[in-house]
Every structure is written in structure tokens, then in C-alpha cells.
Swiss-Prot record:
Protein name: Myosin light chain 2
Subunit structure: Interacts with the IQ domain of MYO1.
PROSITE patterns xrefs: EF_HAND_1, EF_HAND_2
Species of the source: Saccharomyces cerevisiae (strain ATCC 204508 / S288c) (Baker's yeast)
Compartment list: Bud neck
Binding site for Ca(2+): D28, D30, D32, D39
Signal peptide positions (record): none
Annotated GO MF terms: calcium ion binding; cytoskeletal motor regulator activity; myosin heavy chain binding; myosin II heavy chain binding
Gene3D superfamilies cross-referenced by the UniProt entry: EF-hand (1.10.238.10)
Keyword entries, A-Z: Calcium, Cell cycle, Cell division, Metal-binding, Motor protein, Myosin, Repeat
Length: 163
């Protein structure tokens, strides 16, 4: 897939569109066919957070022509697909991520010592990867009981972000 262009509907597999539809329906709290600010406010509240104007603006920028149909009422599914396609086209392919994890781990295994992942992220310009990626590390890291070394589970991570 060419990352210089946004994904179009015909570049998304039917399975992936179905996954995005499921995600859309989960976000559409009031089931009106739109993800509204009210829907997201409810979701944030269940997480103990408050949706700010700034966060809403970042999610649905007014100056983005692909979201011209977004108004006060919210985001329709076609616009949601467009937004997600644009965002997903910025991610590297699975093979690129696999090669990176193998290079970091100096082997063929996708499970990499967490300290090596953190060091590589620092070399790539992240100032505080432990904090910036804390949730990701919490989900995809295990402790090796024998050595007490923390291992980033790369295959599990890749399986969760690719279809």
C-alpha cells in the first residue's frame, strides 16, 4: 500500500471495514448513526475523564476538508472511514514493524527486551518513551520470572494492530 496517499474504501478489506463498523457502533452511544461529542463525552466519563474542547477539535479538525460533513451533530460512518483511512495510511506495514523489532532484538524473535525497545525509541527522538508508551508497554510486556527481565511481546502487539 502506498503510504503517500490516504486509504480509500476499495483499499480496505471487507473484514477491516467490518471491524471499523463495530468500533463505530461502540462509539455511537445513542445509536443515531453519528459519533457525536455527546457520545464521546459519555465514553470519557466512564473512564473518569472529561472531553475537552481541545481534544474534540483534535479528533475532528474543522479545517480538514475530508471531514467537511462533520458538524455539531457528529461524524457519520463514511466520514469515520475516511478519517480512519487517512490515519491508518500513516502507519508502517506489518513487515516493516517486524523487521524493526527483529533488528532491535538482534534475532528472529519478535519478543524483545523492553529496555532495548526503550533505548531504540530514545535514539529515534522520543524523550520519555517509558511515559509516552506506558499503556502500550503495560498491555504487551511480560516479566521473565527467572531473569526478572521485562519483555515486549512484539508478535502479540503486531497481531493486535494488523488484521
Amino acid at each position: 500500500m502506498d503510504h503517500s496517499e490516504s486509504l480509500t474504501f476499495n483499499q480496505l478489506t471487507q473484514d477491516y471495514i467490518n471491524k471499523l463498523k463495530d468500533a463505530f457502533q461502540m462509539l455511537d452511544e445513542d445509536e443515531d448513526g453519528l459519533i457525536s461529542r455527546g457520545d464521546l463525552t459519555k465514553i470519557y466519563a466512564t473512564l473518569g475523564k472529561t472531553l475537552t474542547d481541545e481534544e474534540w477539535s483534535k479528533m475532528v479538525p474543522d479545517n480538514d476538508t475530508s471531514t467537511a460533513e462533520v458538524g455539531e451533530e457528529g461524524v457519520s460512518f463514511p466520514i469515520f472511514l475516511s478519517i480512519m483511512g487517512k490515519n491508518l495510511s500513516q502507519f508502517p506495514e506489518r513487515e516493516e514493524l517486524e523487521e524493526s523489532l527483529k533488528a532491535i532484538g538482534r534475532g528472529h524473535d519478535l519478543n524483545v527486551p523492553l529496555n532495548e525497545v526503550i533505548d531504540s525509541l530514545k535514539e529515534a527522538g522520543f524523550e520519555n518513551p517509558e511515559e509516552e508508551f506506558a499503556k502500550l508497554f503495560k498491555l504487551f510486556t511480560t516479566n521473565q520470572q527467572a531473569t526478572e527481565e521485562r519483555t515486549f511481546r512484539g508478535k502479540l502487539f503486531l497481531d493486535s494492530i494488523t488484521d
